[in-house]
């Protein structure tokens, strides 16, 4: 499944277009490698996402084409969530 679609379906990022923008700005890594929005994700991949001053590391547990809001959190496991200083 494409990275941008997974982030939207799992509700880590609310809209696919926003997921694409974040990836295109170089703020997402998959298994430690800089990723594009079209990167193909697989179960057990680790995705690192930088949201402003927050760094989120999640492990992909499940792939679904669509899901209910209540079930979305079961698609991934949060490994770490840290605050990072902005380089000014």
Curated annotation (Swiss-Prot):
A GO BP entry: translation
Leader sequence segment: none
Record lineage: Bacteria, Bacillati, Bacillota, Bacilli, Lactobacillales
Domain S4 RNA-binding: 1-60
KW tRNA-binding (keyword) present: yes
CDD domains in alphabetical order: S4
Annotated gene: rqcP
InterPro entries, alphabetized: RqcP, S4_RNA-bd, S4_RNA-bd_sf
Keywords linked to the UniProt accession: Protein biosynthesis, RNA-binding, rRNA-binding, tRNA-binding
The keyword rRNA-binding appears for this protein: yes
Quaternary structure and partners: Associates with stalled 50S ribosomal subunits. Binds to RqcH, 23S rRNA and the P-site tRNA. Does not require RqcH for association with 50S subunits.
Name of this chain's protein: RQC P-site tRNA stabilizing factor
Organism this protein belongs to: Streptococcus pneumoniae serotype 4 (strain ATCC BAA-334 / TIGR4)
Family: Belongs to the RqcP family.
PROSITE patterns named in the record: S4
Entry superkingdom: Bacteria
Job of this protein: Key component of the ribosome quality control system (RQC), a ribosome-associated complex that mediates the extraction of incompletely synthesized nascent chains from stalled ribosomes and their subsequent degradation. RqcH recruits Ala-charged tRNA, and with RqcP directs the elongation of stalled nascent chains on 50S ribosomal subunits, leading to non-templated C-terminal alanine extensions (Ala tail). The Ala tail promotes nascent chain degradation. RqcP is associated with the translocation-like movement of the peptidyl-tRNA from the A-site into the P-site.
One Pfam family per UniProt: S4
Entry's Gene Ontology molecular function annotations: rRNA binding; tRNA binding
